[in-house]
Design a protein with these regions (language model features):
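Conserved C-terminal beta-signal and adjacent last beta-strands/turns
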Residues: 31-32, 171, 257-364
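Residues that define the transmembrane beta-barrel architecture of outer-membrane proteins
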Residues: 9-13, 78-82, 122-126, 167-171, ...
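Outer-membrane beta-barrel channels and translocator barrels
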Residues: 20, 24-28, 92-95, 135-139, ...
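Outer-membrane beta-barrel translocator domains and adjoining extracellular loop/strand segments
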Residues: 44-51, 109-117, 153-161, 197-206, ...
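Structural signature of Gram-negative outer-membrane beta-barrels, strongest in the C-terminal barrel
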Residues: 10, 25-33, 37-40, 75-195, ...
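Gram-negative outer-membrane beta-barrel transporters
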Residues: 94, 192, 210-295
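Residues on the lipid-exposed face of transmembrane beta-strands in outer-membrane beta-barrel proteins
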Residues: 15-21, 84-90, 130-134, 173-177, ...
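Surface-exposed loop/turn segments flanking beta-strands in extracellular/periplasmic regions
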Residues: 1, 45-74, 119, 200-201, ...
């Protein structure tokens, strides 16, 4: 029997400051957004592995001491990132055109305390976004968009070198439909995403490595309908085919781990508009997940699962506390036990058990 464990302590600060406004140039209206964001993150990680004596599954004897437990990793990761971004959303007649850009400056360091080594990486990058949409008289709005992405990581490879940031590009085409005089919205989209330098590892004790490229292709469908002033129904479905496009020969063309092939959800909510319970919101929904592969060679497919969630919210404005609201979220209401994902045939992970989260917010 094997054992692996890890610990992490993280401190972080993040700031995002933005300014938006509107200006006209002739017949074109410009909705402008400009901003600066900053994050400074530091985390300390430790990793252990070990071995325990065998156990008889039919006549188990508990309480055995480990043969050994070894500290194999003790690292400090630091990441500092500053981003400057600008977006112009233009409106002319029935056309909508969006252009955006972002410039990032990133500094990353990985300090290996076990081997007394350090690796640093400094990068600058420009990301872009463009989208085009046309509004027809009948409520149909086709659109096309393209964007690039840049995500730094503080993970290091087997030689202690910080991995290159993940880069990606996405094409998306779709159509939105809002029936005239109705209270419903429908959308359908197809997309393709290509990502490079994806950080991954097979076993918990393995070092990280970069996958050359992963390609995702999929379809997304969504429907939102206000059945009445109080009742709202939302349903969605996503089909995704994610494969290793540039990787090791064994993985080439295989489906990626962690990625469901099919996901579907439905959510029904009810708002109390009058009476003693005015301001109360009740909601419940289901999530279905199917087609997660067991490993990078696609040996097996994990069993599908369905989860039930619930929410109770209360807008305290109805009792004179303007802007104040409280909410209780329950995820995995039935406390279903299921396998959510696998790194390999040797390491799989159960999904999150029932969780109950309460929150209070104040808008002013």
């Amino acid at each position: 029997r094997g054992y692996s464990g890890s610990g992490e302590k993280m401190s972080a600060i993040a700031l995002d400051n933005q300014l938006d406004g509107s200006v006209d140039t002739g017949a074109i209206n410009h909705r402008l957004l400009v901003g600066i964001d900053y994050q400074d993150r530091s985390n300390h990680t430790t990793g252990y592995y070990g071995a325990f004596p065998p156990i008889d599954a039919f006549n188990p004897v508990y309480g055995a001491q480990p043969d050994y437990i070894t500290l194999y990793s003790r690292e400090k990761h630091k990441l500092r990132q500053t981003g400057y971004y600008l977006q112009d959303q233009m409106s002319w007649d029935r056309w909508r055109f969006t252009l955006g850009g972002r410039y990032d400056r990133v500094s990353v360091s990985n300090i290996d305390k076990l081997h007394d080594s350090r690796s640093d990486l400094d990068k600058n990058n420009v990301s872009t976004r463009a989208a085009l949409l046309y509004l027809f008289d009948n409520g149909v709005a086709p659109y096309l968009s393209y964007s690039t992405a840049f995500t730094p990581t503080s993970f290091a490879d087997e030689n202690g070198n910080v991995l290159e940031p993940m880069k990606g590009k996405q094409w998306e085409a779709g159509v939105k439909y809002e029936p005239l005089g109705g209270n419903s919205q429908f959308s359908a989209a197809v997309y393709r995403i290509n990502q490079t330098n994806i950080a991954t590892k097979e076993e918990p004790t393995d070092p990280y490595r970069s996958i050359g490229e992963i390609e995702s292709k999929g379809v997304e469908l969504e429907a939102i309908s206000h059945l009445s002033d109080s009742v709202r129904l939302q349903a969605a479905y996503t089909y995704t085919d994610i494969r290793y496009k540039k990787s090791s020969p064994q993985e080439q063309g295989k489906r990626a781990v962690y990625a469901p092939r099919n996901q579907a959800s439905a959510w029904l909510s009810y708002d109390v508009k009058s009476g003693l319970l005015e301001g109360l919101t009740l909601g419940s929904g289901i999530r279905y997940v199917n087609g997660v592969t067991s490993d990078r060679l696609n040996t097996h497919t994990l069993p599908s699962y369905t989860l039930v969630d619930m929410v109770v919210g209360y807008d305290l404005s109805s009792i004179g506390l303007n802007g104040l609201s409280a909410q209780l979220n329950v995820n995995n209401l039935t406390d279903k036990r299921y396998v959510a994902a696998c790194n390999s045939l040797s390491y799989c992970y159960f999904g999150a058990e029932r969780s109950i989260v309460g929150s209070v917010s104040w808008a002013f």
